[in-house]
Amino acid sequence: MQDVPLIPLKVLLGNPLHSSAKVSPDGRYISYLRPSPDKDVLNVWVRSRQAAGGAAGADDVMVTHDTHRGVRLYEWAEDSKHIIFLQDVGGDEDWHLYAQAVDSSSLSRDLTPFKGVRAENIITDPHHPAEVLVGLNKRDPRCFDMHRLNISTGELQLDTENPGDVVAWYADADFQVRAALAMNPSNGSKTLRVRQGPDAAWSDLITWPQEEEGRVVCFAKDGRSIYVTSSLGRDTTELQLLSTDPAAAPAAAAEALQDMPARGAVAAIQRQTSGVAAAAAEGAGSGPASSSSDPAVLSSLASSEKCDVGEVMVDRLQRLPLAVGFNYLRQEWQVLDPSLQADFQLLLSFKGADADLSVEARSLDGSVWLVAYSRDDAATEYCVYDRSAAAAGVGAAGALQFLFMNRPELSSYQLGRRHPVLLQARDGVTLPSYLTLPPLPSIPKSLLAPNPEPSGPGAQGWGSVSGLQLPLVLFVHGGPWARDGWGLDSTAQWFANRGYAVLQVNYRASSGFGKRFLHLGDGQWGVGTMQHDLSDAVAWAIGAGIADKERVAIYGGSYGGYACLAGLAFTPELYCCGVDIVGPSHVRTLLGTIPAYWAPMKRMLVDRIGNAEGDDALNRRISPLYHAAAMRAPLIIAQGANDPRVKRAESDQIYNALKGKGLEVQYFLYEDEGHGFARPPNRLDFCSRVDHFLAKHLGGRTEPPLKMQDTSVVALHEYKSLDDYKPPGAAAAAAAAGAGDSSAEGGRAAAVAAAAAAVAGAAVAGAKHGGSSSSGSGAMGLGQKVGLAVGVPAAVLAGAAVVVVAVLRGLSPRR
């Protein structure tokens, strides 16, 4: 890799120059997150749409003024005059809701200034621009009552009291709270309750048993029906329209369907180069026809046989779903409104098959869209789309205005390609996965070139031509009820740039692939099939000649950190080192210390993980803490002191069990962080330490240690000081690579070429990285989710805007 420049950690993993771009409801302004010029802290910037193109200029104004953690979750208020955003203290996730006038230099106002109280489930409405609805656990820390809040005056009034089991609230077109999602603590089921008015009694509309999936999208405009996604009667979720009063279903159906645009065949917009792209269109009907015997189901609108419903683009004035995204391996779209067919065709044609399209935001009237193009080997591009210009026939070049790239510095570097691969577990279960390979300046003619359009799915056909193998990092996503996806993953690119192959596996229990795949992971932590899937993926990479079996690292955060500890404890022969970020080590103490507001979901956690609190044998079997004696590989442990989900004790106890055993164990505690590392000094300090740790054990490249001035790290133990660290010598690295080349770089380049050649037989096909899913990047608008991580650690360590569970509801579906 001597011809591939080393990418500095700050370029890959520092704060992005631009992120979370949005358009104001009136379409006049563009907003985005950008570091402040003096503190490198993310804040909200605003520019007029007339000055949209290019990098920040004189028209751009920084409207928030955070100086420490930065703003990560924000939205426009419906008046287009205020920004509302959430902020916690030191990663404790006790979110406060703030408001900032965009035309004022005054400090932001804390609208929920209550100590120890968390704000979430925030709903806005275009017909009530002065108000928001917000959930607060002020009365009872275990549950959230809905309050009505005036943005300008700060007046707060109780709207709807929580009976104790409601985990999410929804408002209708009149801005009245009329639906609630309740959890049954006895069996883990979810019930959607509705009422016909603010003073009416609640009634149960639909129940999803613990093994089923369902969520609310929005009320229809008529208030007599509601859009949901549901897996009842099928494996993957589908978009459905339900009557909120089944007794009046025929009348509600006639009225709701009359409001919907006339549809011919539902259009599936996809790339022909995608090997499994057609799967996203399966289940697309010829119009809004019911496919369920449930009298509440008025129509079934969109579905795929391969994956669940992803993001839903909604007309917020008419309260109609316009298009639906599906993400199996890459993003595909089903367009429900025929008037948007030409728009999507134009937008998708602009970048072709090399990029995935997401609609980040829309003006209230739908005339201005803010779209993003994600690639696996380049920065994300944001553009402003003018529908009126497109209608005038000017084409993509005239209707699309380039806004900016999230990390423009990456344009100077060569990045690795991210290959979707369908792996097979030992029991035949298919595991959608992603393999990122180090970049090559060129592919030697003696090797097979990568094939961008393989003929069929699967992992057959991969293999090493030269016989040289790469070090491998198995990068395990958190959740575990989340997923990895396609697109730029800065953490994977960091490893690839250092000379490592990177394998990311959607193991069973990952979300988005249907309820069967999700629940195959129930009770399978640690020594079960969830961990077997990871081991099988490593075995595939070794067997295919991609990975050197002596140099495999396991890296992950949250559940991924648990998987790291489990891998080192239960399959110690497989890994030469590991990195555990905020990972639980003792399942009983994890379940016993969940946040109070997770109490309604406790039964769901027990059903999915196992009753480790009541079954001592199970707890001992799946908790890495009890198997510390089996660990023999070097390990880094990293923890945020204020983590409310995986408490500091989880890292303390595994470190205490390992220290003094003769192992190389390094433990880094960040005192002003929570479930991930939001502050760049801490993030870069951590990544620099990992950079050198992996170089030592995998033989890759590294940059000199970073000396961060404002980090909160406490190094509880270090095997070697970074000041004394010396990278492996060239001869040692070459020997480790198994190469005859006397140059370490020569051996690495040959191994890279061998792995690149193996691409020839892999199945590649598509889904936008991050999307509304996992990885979190578009987490605005999601309600409270329970899981060890949503979109971490990849988003956290890549400096993305979201590092925690997203807590704004009603700001999504996509505008």
Predicted regions and their residues:
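Cap/lid segment of the alpha/beta-hydrolase catalytic domain
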Residues: 406-553, 557-558, 563, 592
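A short helix->beta-strand "capping" segment at the edge of beta-propeller domains
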Residues: 1-18, 57-60, 343-353
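Short loop/turn segments that connect beta-strands within beta-propeller blades
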Residues: 48-52, 102-104, 150-154, 196-198, ...
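Beta-strand-rich domains and repeat architectures in extracellular enzymes and scaffolds
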Residues: 8-43, 369-370
